[in-house]
Amino acid sequence: MAENMTTTQIEVGPGATNATINFEAGILECYERLSWQRALDYPGQDRLNRLKRKLESRIKTHNKSEPESKRMSLEERKAIGVKMMKVLLFMNPSAGIEGFEPYCMKNFSNSNCPNYNWTDYPPTPGKCLDDIEEEPENVDDPTEIVLRDMNNKDARQKIKEEVNTQKEGKFRLTIKRDIRNVLSLRVLVNGIFLKYPNGYKTLSTLHRLNVYDQSGRLVAKLVATDDLTVEDEEDGHRILNSLFERLNEGHSKPIRAAETAVGVLSQFGQEHRLSPEEGDN
């Protein structure tokens, strides 16, 4: 891990996803208009094509998770994205764009709009990422799994056994990967297990997931804030399974925290939350 690696902070939220997709669609519209004017060079044309392909794929994936009444085409999102640019550039409060609602704090000495202090509406009012505790909340008897020099089959089996023996209620799972002298990540998962009368246990809620490097530095953080907690049982299992698969690949090269976070976030369709710069760490 690089010494100057910074913490990758991630928040999963459908509102932010819509805003991002719509804004990028607005950027695509600007690229296309510039191209029509024959004012776009070859690298710019290449970026236009790549952005269009990326957006078409993201919209297709995102629409699957939306009710039919809220699904939008690329063209519809372009129109919203252009309006969002007007909001950003001209601070026009009358735009009324879903998923992007800027607000202003009134200056009591003067109620004219130009004297408002503008800011982006926080995804969770009153709570920002940096205000959330870094460690998953304390629980009794946390489970720790140390995978040392195990082949993939044995490692997966050990994880499966440990997870399935969790008692009902909150849990914290620590996974340490150490194989073939590969740099390992320490992963803390915080969630809730439910126990059924027939003895079957299942992960019902995933609250938080932190990834640390060998020096104990927090390098990736997936946060589900109160209104964004993953409540779906299948989502919880997919996220954990994706994480376990990533940790158990046993590649000879160092495991990268950003890649691990991408693997987890992809289960939400939220891998874009990592910037290219963070992904290169």
Curated annotation (Swiss-Prot):
One of its GO terms (cellular component) is host cell nucleus. Transmembrane segments: none annotated. It is found in: Host cytoplasm; Host nucleus. The keyword Ribonucleoprotein does not apply. InterPro entries: NS1, uS15_NS1_RNA-bd_sf. Homodimer. Interacts with and inhibits human G1P2 conjugation by UBE1L. Belongs to the influenza B viruses NS1 family. This is Non-structural protein 1. It comes from Influenza B virus (strain B/PA/1979).
